[in-house]
Amino acid sequence: MSFIKKIFLSSRSSEDGLFFSKLEKILGFKPLNLTHFRRAFTHRSMNKLDEKGNPMNYERLEFMGDAMLGSVIAAHLFNMSPTGDEGYLTKMRSKIVSREHLNELGKDLNLIQFLESKVTLQNFGENIHGNLFEAFVGAIYLDRGFVYCEKFIHKKVIKPYVDIDKLEGKVISYKSLLIEWCQKEKRVFHYDIYEDEDAGKLKYFGVKLSIDGKVVAKARATSKKKAEEIASKRGYFVFQSEIDGK
């Protein structure tokens, strides 16, 4: 074995050892196959392939993690809410696995530290944290199976964050809530969206929310979706007493 190859293998071994230690601290148990976890933090921009020539990135693991989170949380809600009907259980599960919540979980575990990407972090939106969390859960399932994956979800998601009473009052989407109320009360609503630029020439989207022909809220954000949600939240507080039935 050449001297250079020995140095490379030694460096790789040291790198894997550090990665293993950090994973074990987050997981609470030892990972068996680091390849699954390497994949969970590899962005498609790396253009990596596995030994079979298939793309090696976290996108497929996101799918697996999403399925695991959904099934474990569904089972927990089913057992904890014996009187809840299908609609109630579905709504509660949606609140737990909302994109906002998954992003928070990814941030809390600092999974972004493991990301391999040719895209700079500044060019990723908030959802990268939730995407990595889902992929991480998928990697746990492939590495240790359902039982370990279920334990991890209970420890990191359900136990610290799932409070049924608090979740019942949590709003996932102010836009959906406001539209539902407007339709129920036969109110006419309209989102007027327009492009805007700041001094640094960054593109922003402005939104004016009108209800019954009157502008009740305005917002500005880097995406149409964010601007609509912010305007909807402000609109909600204008009509909160009516919407909440107080």
From Swiss-Prot:
Ranges for domain DRBM come to 173-241
Annotated GO MF terms: double-stranded RNA binding; metal ion binding; ribonuclease III activity; rRNA binding
* Catalyses which reaction(s): Endonucleolytic cleavage to 5'-phosphomonoester
* Cofactors named for this entry: Mg(2+)
Q: Which keywords annotate this record?
A: Cytoplasm, Endonuclease, Hydrolase, Magnesium, Metal-binding, mRNA processing, Nuclease, RNA-binding, rRNA processing, rRNA-binding, tRNA processing
**Compartments, as annotated in UniProt:** Cytoplasm
Catalytic positions are 66, 134
Q: Which CDD domains match?
A: RIBOc
SMART domains tied to this protein = DSRM, RIBOc
Cite a GO CC annotation: cytoplasm
Q: Where is the RNase III domain?
A: 20-145
Q: Which residues bind Mg(2+)?
A: 62, 131, 134
Using the UniProt record, give the first listed, main subcellular location: cytoplasm
| EC numbers, comma separated | 3.1.26.3
Q: Does the keyword Heme apply?
A: no
Q: Which GO terms describe its biological process?
A: mRNA processing; regulation of gene expression; rRNA processing; tRNA processing
Subunit details: Homodimer.
| Function in brief | Digests double-stranded RNA. Involved in the processing of primary rRNA transcript to yield the immediate precursors to the large and small rRNAs (23S and 16S). Processes some mRNAs, and tRNAs when they are encoded in the rRNA operon. Processes pre-crRNA and tracrRNA of type II CRISPR loci if present in the organism.
Classification via NCBIfam families: RNaseIII
Protein name, per record: Ribonuclease 3
